[in-house]
Every structure is written in C-alpha cells, then in structure tokens.
C-alpha cells in the first residue's frame, strides 16, 4: 500500500503556471523591438494582443505572432483554458548577430552597413507578480 503512494508521488502531473517562447535571429533591430516591448511589459495578455494588433510598427507584428505562440504553449500544459488571468511576466530582447556589408561612399570610400538581428524571449504567467523593469 505504501509503495503505491510512493509511486504516485513521483508521477504526479505538475501544474505549470509559466510558459516560455525563445526566438533567435529575428530580422529586426533590437531597438525597434524594445519600443514595442516596453508598451506590453507587465500587462494582461488580452490587452497586449489588442495593442499589438493595432500598432503600426515592424516589431508589433513580430511580437504579436510570438505572443500567440506562447499562449498556445501555455494551453498545451494547462487544462483550464482562461486567457483572462494570464500576464506577461518578462520580455527580454537582446542583440543577435550583425550582417556587415560595405557600401560605396563618396570619393571612393566605403561605408559600413550593419544589418542587426535580435533575440526575443517572452515569459507569461498565470499569477501576477510586480516585476518592474526587466
């Protein structure tokens, strides 16, 4: 009898409250993505989806698609699907690699052109935590 309880203790289904999406090498500069990320940080998911849908910015469409992916990841682990109590806990945007080119400039010189890529990580949580910044 005790061995059965011992086995159930280790094989219990864990309840996940967080969900993460980590996307690498997005063709958009980190500066453009951070402008949008500052608007939706620490907000409800429904409210932030509404903002991202209506924003006219390159980063808005990119973050909108990734946020939908995070929500679907969260729904895979949670049984009770309710979007009303999900919050965006963290949005981390870092610089990826740079593609460097040389463009012809005036008087025979060459000007550097840097195409910047970025890395994005979004964490959503069902419990609201007062994390300001990050």
UniProtKB/Swiss-Prot annotation:
Coiled coil spans: none
One Pfam family hit: Ribosomal_L22
One cellular component (GO) term of this entry: cytosolic large ribosomal subunit
Keywords: Ribonucleoprotein, Ribosomal protein, RNA-binding, rRNA-binding
SUPFAM superfamilies named in the record: Ribosomal protein L22
A molecular-function term among this protein's GO annotations: structural constituent of ribosome
InterPro entries: Ribosomal_uL22, Ribosomal_uL22_bac/chlpt-type, Ribosomal_uL22_bac/org-type, Ribosomal_uL22_sf
Domain of life where this protein originates: Bacteria
BP GO terms, sorted: translation
Record family assignment: Belongs to the universal ribosomal protein uL22 family.
Subunit structure: Part of the 50S ribosomal subunit.
Functional description taken from the UniProt entry: This protein binds specifically to 23S rRNA; its binding is stimulated by other ribosomal proteins, e.g. L4, L17, and L20. It is important during the early stages of 50S assembly. It makes multiple contacts with different domains of the 23S rRNA in the assembled 50S subunit and ribosome.
Protein name: Large ribosomal subunit protein uL22
Organism of derivation: Karelsulcia muelleri (strain GWSS) (Sulcia muelleri)
Source species taxonomy: Bacteria, Pseudomonadati, Bacteroidota, Flavobacteriia, Flavobacteriales
């Amino acid at each position: 009898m005790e061995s059965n309880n011992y086995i159930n203790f280790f094989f219990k289904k864990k309840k996940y409250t967080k969900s993460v999406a980590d996307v690498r090498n997005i063709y958009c500069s980190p500066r453009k993505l951070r402008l949008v990320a500052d608007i939706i940080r620490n907000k409800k998911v429904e409210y932030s989806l509404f903002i991202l849908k209506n924003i006219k910015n390159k980063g808005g469409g990119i973050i909108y698609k990734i946020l939908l992916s995070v929500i679907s990841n969260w729904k895979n682990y949670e049984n009770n699907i309710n979007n009303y109590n999900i919050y965006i806990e963290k949005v981390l945007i870092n610089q990826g690699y740079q593609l460097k080119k040389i463009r012809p400039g005036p008087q025979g010189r060459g000007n550097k052109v840097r195409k910047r890529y970025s890395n994005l990580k979004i964490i959503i949580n069902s419990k609201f935590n007062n994390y300001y910044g990050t």
